């Protein structure tokens, strides 16, 4: 399936782009454009039920308080705000807070003009059911939802009456991980306006003792002298309480200068090489971070994506970073480079010592790389694994060394093996047990969940790198984290009769500047002390490290400090356990194992009252008749994908010949039986929601390009017209029930497929699905799952969800059903269509989608700030024209039909003018099965 374009087409509800439902009869969701205008992490006031800023001073931010307490790396943070409406008009107030990615929300409450809303944790489906029950009665006060980017957002909007007060309070918890020799505690401070009382208090309690502590200046010196730091031997207090005058950007300014982060960095004392073992309230925590050891030699393979999408700043920054990284290699290290696009190249076919001459030659090689072509991740990784395996088999590796592979890529595979689960399996089968794979995903076009599973499966970790001017420093920072292996094969051992439910206690490597944390349970009635024994291999010797902790060692210390959290060991154990279970769930080998793990995660989430990917927080008033819902960000994709290859043929042999000399026979497609076919959707396709929003994925450029078509209800748009193959796909528009904001939204209400050579017509509406073969007609309903088999055309209906139309068991088209509640005042049911890559279309294929079966050359350059700071602009050369495009987000509803998944794309204005051939009206056809007549 090389060189093919992958398409996704769907209508994006403008209402579905927000994450809140305002109160008191306001619109169900915020407008997409409006949402983009709301900077993350700020307080917003929306006067007069509009996004105007007139009269915002009539709403006062009375207080903005943040309290953080860190007890032995376990951080609990509370954010509390109070707002008063002095306006004679009702005002909409948005509570919009950023919290660290990976933190668990544990509580949320708010009081609106005397009415208190409190939270409870429910299993996600139960929580959503409660919310929808209230919504059906018109009793939903709002939708609150956290979402994941580099941070996670927690947001809700309320409407407050004149003279009313509203108070918000959010609790979350996280573990502080040691990185490059210190712990960082970051608090995002973006109140959005002057606050009468702005207070930040950070209390740090570390029984090991504080080695150092300082507060970083992230406000360009504006608040010099304002943070007050009091540091003791084992405790510290950081206070940040600027007055209203100090908050002002300038003495006469009404804008606040508080817009950034308060960052506290610290480290603790370490007297024992065996680490610090702490026991309290039936739980133990073992911290291990030895220093002053000789580094272990590394065998390191850098696998670098040099496909066309890396062109420009990404490649420039990667080269800059790699030159510095190569200079940092030690003389005892061995290394090589694998760079790949659709082809695989190696700087050296084997590992070489990191001498000055070899490093200089490698830097010259890196500097000459010119990005182009596709992305063959599968073969690139297998080549790197092969080099390491050969060196090991030939006895060329120091038996006491550490072997690492570092993958740097910015996109999904487009050449060779495309099925992510197959790549994951190939790597797992070929990599040796002593090799760790680290994956760095540049930008947002890469499937980060895949990289995470790939690395977690092979003793490594993944990290997202943001593709900007800072890429080089991010890459270097990551390398620094793994550049100094001090120990390998680290094992934590405790008496089995004394402890239970121990978290991960075996680690392939320990890197200098980091910390390993192990936790578990014990019975305090049967245990007075706990022994921990660590075995590991250093650069020079096999180590056996022993430590002993007393039961009452912490009790007296914690009792003296009212800020200390007596449940820190319990929370830390739960945090580690749940995250490790989530990782195991994403890599579960079978549905049965996944189900068992899911049950454990769910029970722990409910027991510890935290929002995880399997739970939701229901927020309701005392009467229980007004509700909000807070979900965790979408979880990683898991195991057990379907067996049907979605829209592409099975590759006969995904392993290169130099790895597996015996070619794998072609895997047959599954036989179509009586059950409904389900499959994992391909990573790149298209979607449509309203006015139709088209998204075109260009694999060579590895870019998503999107555009809107504004047409009239009843009109029929041609999506694909291929007279040579005899295939037509058209969509008929329907409209919303009434205007909204002066505009009548349109959607696809019918999708028509015509397979001329088979004399088969398929009509899919929001009510029925019909298959016509000559004079014979089969009609199906969305209310039941079903399967209709024709000689060459199969139709699979998944109840109230999707219709899959499969031709010759080779290519599948998916149509998604989007239902709205029956009495919705504006919206109607509609359809979205997804068209995958296929060789079924001839070179004569055209249409709004069909024309991109043959990918046009594009070049995106001169990226710059746009009118909206959240939406940068760029120039795009395509088809002999230079267009101005805008960066934005669209929704993919295939895996999450309710909230969708954000997909970044470059937006072409004026109904795709310049990107599509001609004008969009050229693609109107008279009938649902009409071929497009090209001028």
From Swiss-Prot:
One of its GO terms (biological process) is hyaluronan metabolic process. Residues 45-174 form the VIT domain. This is Inter-alpha-trypsin inhibitor heavy chain H2. Residues 19-53, 692-935 form a propeptide. Residues 1-18 form the signal peptide. InterPro entries: ITI_HC_C (IPR010600), ITIH (IPR050934), VIT (IPR013694), VWF_A (IPR002035), vWFA_dom_sf (IPR036465). The modification Phosphoserine is found at residues 455, 875. Keywords: Gamma-carboxyglutamic acid, Glycoprotein, Phosphoprotein, Protease inhibitor, Proteoglycan, Secreted, Serine protease inhibitor, Signal. I-alpha-I plasma protease inhibitors are assembled from one or two heavy chains (HC) and one light chain, bikunin. Inter-alpha-inhibitor (I-alpha-I) is composed of ITIH1/HC1, ITIH2/HC2 and bikunin. One of its GO terms (molecular function) is serine-type endopeptidase inhibitor activity. It comes from the Eukaryota. It holds the Pfam family ITI_HC_C. Glycans are attached at residues 107, 434.
């Amino acid at each position: 399936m090389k060189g093919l374009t992958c398409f996704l087409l769907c209508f994006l509800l403008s209402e579905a782009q927000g994450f809140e439902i305002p109160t008191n009869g306001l619109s169900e969701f915020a407008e997409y454009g409006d949402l983009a205008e709301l900077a993350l992490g700020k307080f917003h006031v929306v006067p007069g039920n509009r996004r105007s800023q007139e009269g915002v001073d009539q709403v006062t931010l009375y207080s903005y308080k943040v309290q953080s307490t860190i007890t032995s790396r376990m951080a609990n943070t509370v954010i509390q705000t109070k707002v008063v409406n002095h306006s004679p008009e009702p005002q909409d107030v948005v509570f919009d807070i950023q919290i660290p990615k990976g933190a668990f929300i544990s509580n949320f409450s708010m009081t609106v003009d005397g009415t208190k809303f409190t939270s409870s944790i429910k299993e996600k489906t139960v929580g959503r059911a409660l919310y929808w029950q209230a919504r059906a009665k018109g009793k939903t006060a709002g939708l609150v939802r956290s979402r994941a980017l580099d941070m996670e957002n927690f947001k809700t909007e309320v409407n407050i009456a004149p003279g009313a007060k509203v108070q918000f309070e959010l609790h979350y918890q996280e573990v502080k991980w040691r990185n490059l020799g210190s712990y960082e505690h970051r608090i995002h401070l973006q109140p959005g306006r002057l606050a009468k009382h702005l207070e930040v208090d950070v209390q740090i309690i570390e029984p090991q003792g504080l080695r150092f502590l300082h507060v970083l200046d992230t406000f360009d010196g504006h608040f010099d002298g304002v943070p007050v730091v009091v540091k003791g031997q084992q405790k510290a207090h950081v206070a940040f309480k600027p007055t209203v005058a100090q908050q002002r950007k300038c003495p006469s300014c009404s804008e606040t200068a508080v817009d950034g982060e308060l960052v506290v960095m610290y480290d603790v004392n370490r007297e024992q090489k065996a680490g610090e073992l702490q026991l309290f309230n039936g739980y133990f925590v073992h911290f291990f971070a030895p220093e002053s050891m000789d580094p272990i030699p590394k065998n390191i393979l850098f696998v670098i994506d040099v496909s066309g999408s890396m062109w420009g700043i990404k490649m420039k920054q990667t080269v800059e970073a790699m030159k510095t990284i190569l200079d940092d290699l030690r003389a005892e290290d061995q290394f090589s480079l694998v760079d790949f696009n659709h082809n695989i190249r190696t700087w050296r076919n084997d590992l070489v010592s990191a001498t000055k001459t070899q490093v200089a030659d490698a830097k010259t090689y890196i500097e000459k790389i010119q990005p182009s072509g596709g992305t063959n991740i599968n073969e690139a990784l297998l080549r790197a694994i092969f080099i390491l395996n050969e060196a090991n088999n030939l006895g060329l590796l120091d038996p006491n060394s550490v072997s690492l592979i570092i993958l740097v890529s910015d996109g999904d595979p487009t050449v060779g093996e495309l099925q992510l689960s197959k790549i994951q399996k190939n790597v797992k089968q070929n990599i040796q047990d002593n090799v760790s794979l680290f994956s760095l995903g540049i930008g947002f076009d890469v499937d980060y969940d895949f990289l995470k599973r790939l690395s977690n499966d092979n003793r490594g970790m993944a990290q997202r790198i943001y593709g900007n001017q800072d890429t080089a420093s991010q890459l270097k920072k990551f390398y620094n984290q793994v550049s100094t292996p001090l120990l390998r094969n680290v094992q934590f051992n405790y008496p089995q009769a004394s402890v239970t439910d121990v978290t991960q206690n075996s680690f392939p490597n320990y890197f200098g500047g980091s910390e390993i944390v192990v936790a578990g349970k014990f019975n305090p009635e049967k245990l007075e002390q706990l022994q921990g024994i660590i075995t590991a291999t250093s650069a020079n010797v096999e180590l056996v490290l022993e430590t002993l902790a007393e039961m009452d060692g912490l009790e007296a210390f914690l009792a003296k400090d009212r800020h200390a959290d007596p449940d820190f060991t319990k929370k830390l154990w739960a945090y580690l356990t749940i995250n490790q279970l989530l990782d195991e769930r994403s890599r579960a080998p079978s549905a049965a194992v996944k189900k068992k793990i899911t049950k454990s995660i769910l029970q722990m989430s409910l027991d510890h009252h935290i929002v995880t990917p399997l739970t939701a927080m229901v927020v309701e008033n005392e009467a229980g008749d007004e509700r909000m819902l807070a979900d965790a960000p979408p979880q990683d994709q898991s195991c057990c994908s379907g067996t049907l290859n979605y829209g592409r043929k099975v590759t006969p042999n995904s392993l290169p010949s130099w790895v597996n000399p015996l070619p794998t026979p072609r895997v047959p497609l599954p036989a179509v039986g009586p059950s409904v076919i389900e499959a994992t959707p391909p990573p790149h396709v298209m979607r449509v929601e309203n006015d139709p929003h088209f998204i075109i994925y260009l694999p060579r450029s590895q870019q998503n390009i999107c555009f809107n078509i504004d047409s009239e209800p009843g009109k029929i748009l041609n999506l694909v017209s291929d007279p040579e193959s005899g295939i037509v796909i058209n969509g008929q528009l329907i409209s919303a029930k009434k205007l909204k904001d002066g505009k009548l939204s349109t959607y696809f209400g019918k999708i028509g497929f015509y397979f001329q050579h088979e004399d088969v017509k398929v009509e899919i509406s929001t009510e029925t699905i019909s298959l016509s073969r000559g004079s014979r007609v089969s009609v199906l309903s969305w209310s039941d799952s079903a399967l209709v088999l024709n000689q060459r055309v199969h139709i699979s209906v998944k109840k109230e969800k999707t219709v899959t139309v499969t031709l010759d068991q080779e290519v599948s088209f998916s149509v998604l059903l989007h239902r709205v509640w029956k009495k919705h005042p504006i919206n109607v049911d509609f359809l979205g269509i997804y068209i995958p890559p296929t060789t079924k279309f001839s070179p004569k294929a055209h249409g709004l989608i069909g024309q991109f079966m043959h990918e046009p050359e594009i070049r995106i350059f001169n990226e710059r700030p746009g009118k909206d700071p959240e939406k940068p602009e760029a120039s795009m050369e395509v088809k002999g024209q230079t267009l101005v495009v805008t960066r934005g987000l669209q929704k993919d509803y295939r895996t999450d039909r309710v909230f969708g998944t954000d997909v970044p794309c470059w937006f072409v204005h004026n109904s795709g003018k310049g990107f599509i051939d001609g004008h969009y009206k050229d693609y109107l056809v008279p009938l649902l099965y009409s071929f497009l007549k090209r001028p």
